[in-house]
């Protein structure tokens, strides 16, 4: 073909981060589909090439690695869609359309300069400084494809990086653009945030930028403390983040982490003031289990056994704590074992993570 070709994106980023990659993106100045077919024909056994002619892309899987080929291109977007109009471009044009500078890095695959490192937007410096920054003005990057706002926060949570100041401001300014993105795509990024080493990093950024109020308003309602007659309750938003982080230290079970997020979700709706005891949230576990269904349905999360599992844990999350009281009966313990069934161990993990008190005697009990 004699078309200049380059490895770009996540593979190059992960090379410098010394992280494994499951996919390799290859950009050529020419026909990406034709290049994919030519490369596949040279491999044994020859993999099946899947093509997307509208975008000029093709991919195949070989040795458990997914290869994606695309012709270098320019993209332009309309105000109400994230589907771009595409035209042929140069390597630099293609790098400009990337979401972040750390994903705009490239290695040449051309025989006369094989392995040459190409960094048009100082992405390696940003990578070394652990900064998430866009190649273009962030307003253009996020307005063109608002899902990139979720990706920025996801990368911050996954890698422990910080958002560049202008990038963070653009997230706040263009947050409403997230409305043109499908719930499925938002949920996919949200799940990646939840599965990150310290999910609170991502949720705090969602909170600070205003995105949380749009994609997950029920969680935002947990924020705040009300004080009456000198008595206040804990901020259930920050408590939830602490529970989530606690649980994330011991499990990578996505749906158990969702149970941590939703275990107190109904506290705003069940909050009551009683002069003799102060604030109460009676029945929040029952209403919360009902809300799991509504939230999963809106976010287009699985409505199968995974949702029911989260409901079960939310409904039962107070039961183990109640067993710490004196004079508890063997029958109460047996009832919990029967009611929790196969989820008992996970329930106990959630219960332990839910203990965020600074009072060591309470923790010990």
Across the structure, where does each feature detected by a protein language model lie?
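Catalytic cores of the polymerase beta-like nucleotidyltransferase superfamily
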Residues: 1-365
């Amino acid at each position: 073909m004699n078309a200049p070709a380059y490895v770009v994106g996540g593979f190059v980023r992960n090379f410098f981060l010394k992280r494994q990659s499951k996919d390799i993106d290859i950009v050529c100045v020419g026909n990406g589909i034709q290049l994919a077919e030519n490369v596949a024909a040279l491999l044994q056994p020859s993999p099946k090439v899947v093509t997307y002619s509208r975008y000029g892309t093709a991919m195949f899987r070989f040795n458990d690695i997914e290869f994606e080929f695309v012709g270098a291109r320019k993209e332009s977007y309309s105000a109400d869609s994230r589907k771009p109009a595409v035209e042929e471009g140069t390597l630099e044009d293609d790098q400009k359309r990337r979401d972040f500078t750390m994903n705009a890095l490239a290695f040449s695959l051309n025989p006369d300069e094989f392995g040459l490192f190409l960094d048009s937007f100082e992405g390696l410096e940003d990578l070394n400084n652990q900064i998430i920054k866009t190649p273009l003005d962030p307003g253009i990057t996020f307005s063109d494809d608002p899902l990139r706002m979720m990706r920025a926060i996801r990368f911050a949570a996954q890698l422990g990086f910080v958002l560049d100041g202008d990038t963070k401001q653009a997230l706040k300014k263009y947050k409403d653009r997230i409305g043109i993105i499908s719930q499925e795509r938002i949920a996919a990024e949200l799940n990646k945030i939840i599965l990150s080493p310290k999910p609170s990093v991502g949720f705090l950024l969602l909170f600070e930028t205003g995105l949380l109020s749009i994609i997950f308003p029920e969680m935002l309602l947990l924020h705040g403390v009300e004080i009456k007659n000198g008595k206040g309750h804990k901020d259930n938003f920050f408590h939830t983040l602490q529970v989530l982080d606690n649980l994330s230290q011991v499990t990578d079970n996505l749906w158990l982490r969702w149970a941590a997020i939703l275990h107190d979700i109904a506290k705003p709706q069940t909050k009551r003031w009683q002069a003799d005891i102060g604030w109460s949230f009676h029945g929040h576990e029952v209403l919360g289990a009902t809300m799991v269904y509504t939230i999963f349905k809106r976010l287009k999360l699985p409505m199968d056994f995974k949702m029911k599992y989260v409901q079960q844990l939310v409904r039962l999350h107070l039961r183990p704590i109640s067993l710490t009281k004196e004079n508890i009966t063997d029958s109460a313990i047996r009832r919990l074992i029967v009611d929790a069934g196969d989820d008992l161990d996970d329930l106990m993990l959630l219960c332990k993570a839910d203990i965020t008190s600074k009072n060591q005697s309470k923790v010990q009990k």
